[in-house]
């Protein structure tokens, strides 16, 4: 079953993640412009400051966000949360983001710095309480506000805003830290009425590599008009099934933030919770958020595999998710995946210690566990456990083939209900230990 | 801050764990005899079968146990649980243990095999429902009952039982799997009345390396007479503060069992919950169990460090424990320890995402975090966070010295109450990934 380290190395080198996952073109939502610069906060001179701006004036924009639940919340998280609450999710027209410094665990001074970033952008756009701020990078260090201030001046001055592909890609680059590729996704959707709209998203993160790299940021913007409460409901639903369903190392940072702006630049009736299109848009946003979140796992520190953990036929969604998370976070499952070992025992074990809300969710005699190939090769499914009974004579050749894939699926059929949850995880490699054992040095 | 890999290698080689942690002599509780053999279940011919026997007839023995809460419980766990319940914790006079095969996820046949092991030993001692069984090793494989049966005959036949140091050490060896040294602890205690008694314990485990190596087993025997309910209460209390407070990789196996026998061979009044000595014996058993549990962490797979996580001045014991566990299980904290990096950010982060029962347990403005040297060098304490404020000018030379130690302490003072909890953990190394990436192969 063991694959030689040479082969592992080779299969790793075969993936040019930038070529595979970074788009080369795209169209973007109406009424948004973006700006970016290298402020100097990042010592190597890379892009490290970005602004997303809503320029549509036809109707008020709406905003929603999901923030980290870590009890140590960074200054930009606390500050943006307050802005959003005061604005009641309306008239947020700018997001300013910097990388290189997370402005986290920086006390009162850090809170002031976050507010100054907001005030600088509010001044530029001539509006009050209309800007959200986000920061990512090293924690426990103060922002170099002179550089940030000069950078914001530059973006609103000589650097100019743009709405073309390169501008969006550069903003996606400006929020990166240990990411090996920028994460930009854009997609057009159609509603039954024929109305077309666009979702564009960016994310950063290459591990819940908290909080030194202070961590997961995600932005989604759309030109569809969505009422603010409906928008928050959609984003919360989508985040629960996307950004909250990924595991690199199971650590949640002080800065995690996912936010969404809807500017209503498309001339159609505003969608609220009672609209007939509400459910469809919610699902489209969810699927879109999943694509974005999956890119974070694909860039998981040191990872060689992208693994979908699919828990189905569960009594409750929440318990399906708890089981998917338990498998996805298990160090033993992750090392087995790295070692390309069809170790069903570790998967069962992680299911067995998951802390379920309802014990009836799991019946040890009904469970089915399989590896699923994602490359159209046959047989697609390799059964490891059938109705609670381990398959002692597994086709080891086929197991090797599936486990050698860069993408694969672990399928768990609980057989206790009709609910399902997915998680996306990566393997735990020597490289992960090297990256995280040496980072701060 | 980074220590060269050569230095890491060297500091690792300096620890001869066998010489440091395996006793060379010891005295044992009255009325117990032990037997052992190499049954052939382990292919390499190592010891793999052991029996602990109570021979004291002066009064009935008592027994207690704490079993894994994993929903996939191995056959010996389910079978022993039933024996203990039927016996109501009384008249258990033998424990039979094998290594090399965990008899886990083996269905009805596995249940029968576990019962046969019990029946064989019951027959030998001429008693009914008096034997507990435990197994550890590979899961999903059936026990080779012919070898087990021959082995039990040998132990009760030509191999003979003994109560000397070598017999005890050999039983400790017979329960090992990936352990690099046998874990045997024996100690004499004195009660205020002048009565002396002995605790002897054995454990196996080198990681919660579940369930392939199927995992943590611990046995404690004493010659003190302890009423069965009081014994269960003591063992549960002790396990909560010892075997349940260790982390190698956070995975809990299908076979985890800690059990305790008290044979009352010492001529003194039986201790029950109302006895004046109850609290003292409980604390002595707890401290003893901690010594035994710590040996499991010291043998943690691939580990180079033994780290005590000390959470004090907490509002509740349970929340102190949840925080200690969160720090101890964090992959980022573990890799930072391996990299000898004074990364307080990762420790704060793990504290911040711990799922507390009472949010008032954590006040982000009151928290103190330090590294503590354990080698009597000064200054003993290196403050990383004081009253919620990170110490930005840490003495990096001193940090390097403390982090280069094989033993160190992470101290977290929550400042919200007067409760405390401890966890013992180890670092996450390249070696761990190698061991667990390649195991089943």
Swiss-Prot record, chains A, B:
Active-site residue list: 215 (nucleophile)
Annotated site (Involved in the stabilization of negative charge on the oxyanion by the formation of the oxyanion hole): 136-137
Matches recorded under Pfam families: ArgJ
Name of this chain's protein: Arginine biosynthesis bifunctional protein ArgJ, mitochondrial
Localization per Swiss-Prot or TrEMBL: Mitochondrion matrix
Enzyme Commission identifier(s): 2.3.1.35, 2.3.1.1
GO cellular component: mitochondrial matrix; mitochondrion
UniProt GO molecular function: glutamate N-acetyltransferase activity; L-glutamate N-acetyltransferase activity
Organism, as annotated: Saccharomyces cerevisiae (strain ATCC 204508 / S288c)
InterPro entries reported for this sequence: Arg_biosynth_ArgJ (IPR002813), ArgJ-like_dom_sf (IPR016117), ArgJ_beta_C (IPR042195)
Subunit structure of this chain's protein: Heterodimer of an alpha and a beta chain.
HAMAP family in the cross-refs: ArgJ
Pathway, per record: Amino-acid biosynthesis; L-arginine biosynthesis; L-ornithine and N-acetyl-L-glutamate from L-glutamate and N(2)-acetyl-L-ornithine (cyclic): step 1/1; Amino-acid biosynthesis; L-arginine biosynthesis; N(2)-acetyl-L-ornithine from L-glutamate: step 1/4
Residues that, per the record, bind substrate: 177, 204, 215, 301, 436, 441
Catalytic reaction equation(s): N(2)-acetyl-L-ornithine + L-glutamate = N-acetyl-L-glutamate + L-ornithine; L-glutamate + acetyl-CoA = N-acetyl-L-glutamate + CoA + H(+)
Family the entry assigns: Belongs to the ArgJ family.
Post-translational modification: The alpha and beta chains are autoproteolytically processed from a single precursor protein within the mitochondrion.
């Amino acid at each position: 079953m063991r694959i030689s380290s040479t082969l592992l190395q080779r299969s790793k080198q075969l993936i040019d993640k930038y070529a595979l996952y970074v788009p080369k073109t795209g169209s973007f939502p109406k009424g948004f412009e973006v700006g970016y610069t290298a402020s100097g906060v990042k010592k190597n001179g890379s892009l490290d400051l970005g602004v997303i701006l809503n320029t549509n004036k036809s109707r008020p924009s709406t905003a929603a966000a999901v923030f980290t639940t870590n009890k140590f919340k960074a200054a930009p998280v606390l500050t943006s949360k307050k802005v959003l609450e005061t604005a009641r999710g309306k008239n947020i027209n700018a997001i300013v983001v910097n990388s290189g410094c997370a402005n986290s665990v920086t006390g009162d001074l850090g809170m002031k710095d976050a507010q100054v970033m907001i005030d600088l952008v509010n001044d530029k756009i001539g509006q009050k309480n209309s800007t959200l701020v986000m920061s990512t990078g090293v924690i426990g260090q103060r922002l170099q506000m002179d550089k940030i201030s000069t950078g914001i001046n530059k973006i609103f001055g000589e650097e100019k805003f743009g709405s073309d592909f390169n501008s969006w890609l550069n903003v996606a680059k400006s929020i990166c830290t240990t990411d090996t590729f920028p994460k930009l996704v854009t997609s057009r959707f159609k509603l039954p009425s024929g109305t077309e709209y666009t979702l564009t998203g960016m994310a950063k993160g290459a591990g819940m590599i908290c909080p030194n790299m202070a961590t997961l940021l995600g932005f989604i913007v759309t030109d569809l008009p969505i009422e603010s409460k409906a928008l928050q409901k959609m984003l919360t639903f989508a985040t629960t099934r996307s950004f909250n369903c990924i595991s690199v190392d199971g650590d949640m940072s002080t800065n995690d933030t996912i936010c969404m702006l809807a500017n209503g630049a498309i001339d159609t009736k505003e969608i609220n919770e009672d609209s007939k299109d509400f459910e469809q848009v919610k699902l489209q946003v969810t699927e879109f958020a999943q694509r974005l979140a999956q890119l974070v796992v694909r860039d998981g520190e040191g990872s060689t595999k992208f693994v979908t953990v699919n828990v189905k036929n569960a009594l409750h969604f929440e318990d399906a998710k708890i089981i998917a998370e338990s498998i996805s976070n298990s160090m033993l499952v992750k090392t087995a995946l790295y070692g390309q070992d069809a170790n069903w025992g570790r998967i069962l074990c992680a299911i067995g210690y998951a802390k379920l809300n309802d014990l009836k969710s799991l019946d040890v005699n009904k469970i089915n566990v399989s590896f699923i190939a994602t490359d159209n090769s046959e047989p697609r499914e390799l059964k490891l456990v059938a109705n609670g009974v381990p398959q002692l004579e597994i086709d080891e050749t086929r197991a090797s083939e599936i486990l050698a894939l860069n993408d694969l699926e672990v399928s768990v059929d609980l057989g206790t209900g009709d609910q399902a949850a997915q998680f996306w995880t990566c393997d735990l490699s020597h490289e992960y230990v090297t990256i995280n054992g040496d980072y701060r040095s």
